[in-house]
């Protein structure tokens, strides 16, 4: 309601615009129900054409089903990679969302198989265990700093947990996943005496600040 509110936006961009774009080139079914409502709503749209809008019984929360992506735009469809590759991209994105929002339960089903299902219990360590496995979850060091202008929370891995690329490095600003070469180099420099050359640490660090920050780092 005020200009200052723009400095503390917790959403992740133009979600409505993205959904509209997806609905224009696929068959989309949405089932949604607020926790305080008696019934839910089922909404179906195919190629931007509204097919159904009806009340139904549904659990709390929102489910999106996207089928036949680019079915009506074959020129775009040919640029899609294999189903396995595209599914991996989606899984990676949802893992990042889950890590930055541990209080939300995410469930991702691909070809009738559950690829990701988080509890939403708010515990970051449980999420790391679920996504990365027992070995990493058992070798974590907690980070918890609260200052006047920002807070930093999450986990870093002991030096025994490393890999040959930066896929284990996860950084978030105000709930948004970012990639920052400056931040990565700073963390890696701190591990310099503990890791072999071309080995990279595990990190899951969430930076939170109500002050204006440039988030165009990813």
What do the PLM-derived regions correspond to, one by one?
Residues 1-209, 213, 218:
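N-terminal phosphate-binding caps/lids of nucleotide- and nucleic-acid-binding domains
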